[in-house]
Amino acid sequence: MAIQSTRRLRRASSLLKKSKPYNKEKTNLSLSLSLKELHSVFKLFPEYELKFLNMMKLPITGKEPIKIPFDLSLHHQHTCLDLSPYANEQVSKSACVNCGTTNIPTASDAMVAYMNQISNVMQNRLYYYGFQKKVELIRMSAKQPTLFQIFYILSSIASNFLPIMFENNEKLNMYVVFQTRTLHIPCECINQIMTVSSGYTVLLDILHDSIVLHVLCKTIETSNIQIDINVLQRKIEEMDVPDEIGDKFEKLKHILPFI
């Protein structure tokens, strides 16, 4: 054990001597060292302590400010997102005080829900309100399951949001408007959203007093998943949209482009 520990200390000091910025090899090695071993390295080579801190992705507080709009592809793994009027931050999961025991659906769970959606129209009615009964948008959704999957995943962490579908460049896109300026998105929720978002740009923005998730389609990927769009369309057309939801759509038309 003593020999192995010595070898790892030498390897750590060798990597820390390099002047290159953060790299995966350094991080993997530093994570494999115990606190006692790291302390030994820093005791022998005090100048390496600063290098070690510089190569960390997040500050020692476990928090890092983000710029709005924020592209979710820039999200650090194992970090949550905290947005509020006071700060917009990525927060290390180990330092997060807002994560509860919420069960986040996986990408596979969301796809199963998409395939079974005709049997659960009322359960997911908020999603269908977002089409505003526009037939062409409803039919486009049959080729883009990603939008439903993202809605389904987000439904596990929030209820005070409104999806809005719109067409741009012959592709279906979605805004998700959170009717609040305070929002916590757990890291697992972000991971699952990014898993289903191939071919999409997903951005977080703040407009007026709302947080808005932009789900913008770049390319439509071929899917073998089929749903009976005629049955779904009929059910959506028969659905009553509450006046409150209709009023919100009218207000958002003055804020959001393309709708």
Swiss-Prot record:
Gene Ontology cellular-component annotations: host cell nuclear inner membrane; membrane
GO process terms (BP): viral budding from nuclear membrane
Top-level division of the source organism's lineage: Viruses
UniProt-listed Pfam families: Herpes_UL31
Main subcellular localisation: host cell
Zinc finger boundaries on the chain: CCCH-type: 80-184
Record keywords: Host membrane, Host nucleus, Membrane, Metal-binding, Phosphoprotein, Zinc, Zinc-finger
Family in the record: Belongs to the herpesviridae NEC1 protein family.
Function: Plays an essential role in virion nuclear egress, the first step of virion release from infected cell. Within the host nucleus, NEC1 interacts with the newly formed capsid through the vertexes and directs it to the inner nuclear membrane by associating with NEC2. Induces the budding of the capsid at the inner nuclear membrane as well as its envelopment into the perinuclear space.
Designated name of the protein: Nuclear egress protein 1
